[in-house]
Structures are given as C-alpha cells and as structure tokens.
Regions:
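Glycine-rich loop(s) and the adjacent beta-strand/alpha-helix scaffold that form part
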Residues: 153-193
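A conserved FAD-binding loop/helix module that cradles the flavin
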Residues: 153, 159-160, 165-171, 367-396
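Short hydrophobic core segments
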Residues: 5-7, 32, 133, 149-161, ...
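A conserved short coil-to-beta-strand element within the FAD-binding core of flavoproteins
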Residues: 129-141
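Glycine-rich FAD pyrophosphate-binding loop
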Residues: 21-47
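Short beta-strand to alpha-helix junction loop
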Residues: 73-81, 100-120, 157-159, 163, ...
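N-terminal Rossmann-like FAD-binding beta1-loop-alpha1 element of flavoenzymes
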Residues: 2-31, 387-392
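Residue-level recognition of phosphate/Mg2+-coordinating polar/acidic sites
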Residues: 22-23, 37, 58-61, 78, ...
Length: 397
C-alpha cells in the first residue's frame, strides 16, 4: 500500500486529501496539522462566509489577480478551473451563489458548510492534529515529536507564514522570504480619519513606482482599506516590505485624468456661477468639503469666484491627492503572504520537486498569492488538485 503524507490541514491540504480518498481509497493518506483544528483559517475566511472562488470576469489578465505565480496558475486553472471548483462543491452538498462583484460564496453564506463538505470527502484519511512536523529527510521520513513515519509521497501545504517553513530547511530548497501581501494602509490625518465609513470608487497608486489599483476605497479611522487598498498592498507587497511600509500614496478620487476633471469643473462653473462650490459635488458631501479645504478653498466660495488658481488646486487634489504612508494594518478577513517555496524548485505542470521526486507543494506555501476576492482559495483548490492528480499518475505508472 502506497503511503501519502500531507503536511498542513488547510484548504489545499484537505482538498488534496479529499480527492485522493475519492479517487484512490486504497492509498494510505495521513494529514499532519500543528494546530488543534483542521481548516481553522478556512472557517473564518471572508468574514465566516467563505469566498470560495471568483468568476474571473472582473480582471483583464491573470497577473492582475496573481501578482506572483501567474505561470503556475495559468497551468493549474486549465486542470481545475473556477467552474470545476463550483461544480465540485455543489456536488458535495454546498450549493453556491455568484455575487455582483464576481465572487462565489456558499448559498448558506456559512464557511462551516465548506469545512464539513471537505471533512466528509476526506473521511478515511488519518488526520493527526496538534502534531508538528519537525523535519522531512530525503527518503521521505516525516519526523514529529511523537514518532518517525516513512512515506512514498509527501505533499507540503503548510501555508505561507514563516513558522510553517522551518521543517523544510534540511532539504535545502530555495525559499523566497515571506512578507505580508494583503493589508490596509495607516495614514495619520485627523480630518481624513473623521470620514470613517465613507466608501467610493477610486484609483490608488504608490508614488515613485508603477504600482496602482482601482476599486472601492474605504476610509477608516486609521487610514485606508477596501478592495483598492488591498489590491495595491498585494501588488506592492515586497516593495513595501523593503521600505518598511513607508512611502507616499496618491489617490485619484474621480478615476479620471486631469483634462476630464478640469473640464467637469469648468462646466460646473459655467452652469452654476452663483452657486456655492460646496453645493455641486461629484463625491459625497463630507468628502467634498474635506477636499475643498485641502485645496485651500474658503467656505462660501462661489463657482464664479473659483478662478484659474482655484481650478488648478482643486483639479490637483481630485486627481492626485497625496498622503504619507506611516505603516500597515492587518486586514482581519485575510491572512496572506507573498513568498514561500520558489517556483524554480518545482515542475510547473505537476507541482513536484525537481530535486526530490515524490515531494509536492500546494497552496500558499508556494510563492503564489493573489488579491482579495476568492483568488487565493482558487489557488488552493487548483494546486491541491494538481498534486492529487500527479500522485495518482505516479501510483499507476
């Protein structure tokens, strides 16, 4: 009987175990998990609702969703796509619904339904909780504090946190240092922070770089959050880690260029010369008042009094409003890192180690990560599937 070890009982590891149990019940599958519960992160992702995947219709390219790991994901999605993921979970008792933002969720909006479906599918696997793997030797003996276990195949699915990687050190694999890749921005601006809860579509960029993102922007009492912020944090993850999470953020509040904004302001001045500038606003009133003050425009100013200098200042604030970045804050619903096992170590079609045939990697332990919106979980499903399929082929050749 061939023996398979899966190290890490997260989404990728449990999905891989479930597939192996369904496809090849004759295999012995052992799942090692250092924590007290399997799929603990999955149970709380998406605010406990579990954003299973995305329909990929809201992105222009795969690199937009996967800043790191696009090549692997292009191959993995051909093997197990987002449609395949929805079909699998539906067939396993988790009907799914698609939201307007392109995100797929369980119809019940309960992540535990996903957890329970995976637990049912992987029934028969030996799941060892509170069992930390200390090392893996070249002959695939998995060492734990309790005992040493020989295996024919090993799948590493420990996630991207640095604490999940030390047991790989003896294999001398190339590891990309992990850094946070989904977080919010800390901006110390009392007047801005007073606008807490305000949301609008905006463009964000990191001044002096090519990193930029567009989407709903949420103003918080500590700075910026929301999809636009999270996308930018993902795209610029390694750059920001290197700079100590310092820099200058630029916000385009209207998602329009200077010429377009200037034209709108001029038309407003022509159409409403005697109205107050504060009374005709392209954004929410509270934000508009804040931006007028930031542009140095006095209260009670009429459109006829705006003048060319006022027009220039207001155009600049609306299209390129800058804020010193003073740090990052954890995004509570996502725990994602950039980094992990370098993709140069593995076969891109099989996710098998080039140095150690029979050793596979899936999920966030690889140097693959994505923006928010279900893309990271899809990476777990797709890479877990590729590993299970690769092992099955190995056992039957």
């Amino acid at each position: 009987m061939k023996r398979v070890a899966i190290i890490g009982a997260g989404a990728a590891g449990c999905f891989c175990a479930a597939l192996l149990r369904e496809w090849a019940p004759e295999l012995s599958v052992t799942v090692f998990e250092a924590g007290a519960k399997p799929m603990a992160k999955l149970a709380i992702t998406g605010g406990g609702r579990c954003n299973l995947t995305n329909d990929f219709q809201g992105i222009q390219s795969l690199a937009e969703a996967y800043p790191r790991g696009e090549r692997v994901m292009k191959r993995a999605l051909k093997v197990f796509s987002q449609e395949d993921a929805i079909a699998w979970f539906t067939a396993h008792g988790v009907p799914c619904v698609l939201q307007e933002d392109h995100c797929w969720f369980p119809q019940s909006q309960d992540a535990m339904d996903v957890v329970r479906a995976l637990q049912r599918a992987m029934r028969g696997a030996d799941v060892r909780l509170n069992t930390k793997v200390i090392s893996i030797c070249h002959s695939f003996v998995v060492k734990t504090p309790q005992d040493d276990n020989p295996f024919d195949y090993v799948v590493v699915t420990t996630g991207g946190a640095p604490k999940g990687l030390p047991f790989l050190e003896g294999l001398e694999l190339e590891l990309v240092p992990p850094v946070p890749s989904l977080f919010t921005f800390t901006v110390k601006d009392a007047a801005l922070n007073a606008l807490t809860g305000l949301v609008l579509e905006a463009q964000m960029s990191l001044q002096g770089t090519s990193f930029k993102a567009q989407g709903p922007l949420l103003i918080t009492d500590w700075g910026f959050s929301g999809p636009a912020t999270l996308k930018l944090s993902s795209y610029a993850a390694r750059h920001l880690a290197e700079t100590g999470y310092k820099g200058t953020l630029a916000v385009n509040w209207l998602c329009a260029n200077e010429e377009e904004v200037r034209g709108w302001l001029q038309r407003s001045a022509s159409a409403h010369p005697q109205k107050l500038v504060s009374s005709v606003h392209p954004v929410q009133q509270r934000l508009w008042d804040y931006l007028l003050a930031k542009a140095g425009l006095r209260e009670g100013l009429r459109w006829a009094e705006l003048g060319s200098k006022g027009l220039n200042r207001l155009t600049a604030v609306l299209t390129h409003d800058t804020y010193p970045l003073s740090g990052k804050s954890k995004f509570r619903e996502e725990f994602v890192t950039a980094g992990g096992v370098a993709l140069s170590n593995i076969g891109l079609n099989t996710l098998e180690s080039k140095q150690y045939p029979g050793l596979f990697f899936a999920g966030e332990v690889l140097d693959i990560d994505a923006i928010t919106g279900g893309f990271n979980l899809q990476a777990a499903w797709s890479t877990g599937y590729v590993c299970a399929e690769s092992i099955l082929k190995c056992t039957r050749t």
